A protein has these predicted regions:
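Juxtamembrane/interface motifs at transmembrane-helix termini
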Residues: 32-34, 50-54, 105-106
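Localized chelating/binding microdomains
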Residues: 9, 38, 62-68, 73, ...
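Enriched for short, Lys/Arg-rich terminal
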Residues: 72-112
């Protein structure tokens, strides 16, 4: 089994998700949802290739992989015997821009 290590940004992301959920839905729902995210992340220690590579899905040169965990994308990379959790981002956010500084193409670009 591989060791899982969280980046400071990933820990901050989880705290922000907790804060949002707590304000919107209360403690019970928050605890249940965070446990689901952590459970999915833990599966990576046994199945590190479970996630999809960003390069596979978006054709972007990146070593990051991701999994979907309870309405969030968990971005990680494999470093020797370590799974490094890079970010945990709400699926509705512009994660490519946040993670890699890449703006997705828009329909406006097609009109030019």
């Amino acid at each position: 089994m591989m060791k899982i290590v969280f980046s400071p940004e990933a820990l901050k992301d989880i705290e922000e998700i907790k804060s949002y959920l707590l304000g919107q839905f209360g403690e019970e729902t928050t605890t249940k949802n965070i446990k689901k995210v952590i459970k999915e992340i833990r599966t990576l220690s046994s199945f590190p290739l479970k996630g999809t590579g960003i390069w596979e899905r978006y054709g972007i040169d990146s070593e990051y992989r991701y999994i979907y965990a309870n309405k969030n994308y968990v971005f990680y990379r494999i470093e020797d015997n370590v799974i490094r959790i890079i970010r945990v981002l709400d699926a509705r956010r512009d994660f490519l821009n946040i993670l890699l500084g890449i703006k997705p193409p828009t329909d406006d670009n097609d009109k030019e």
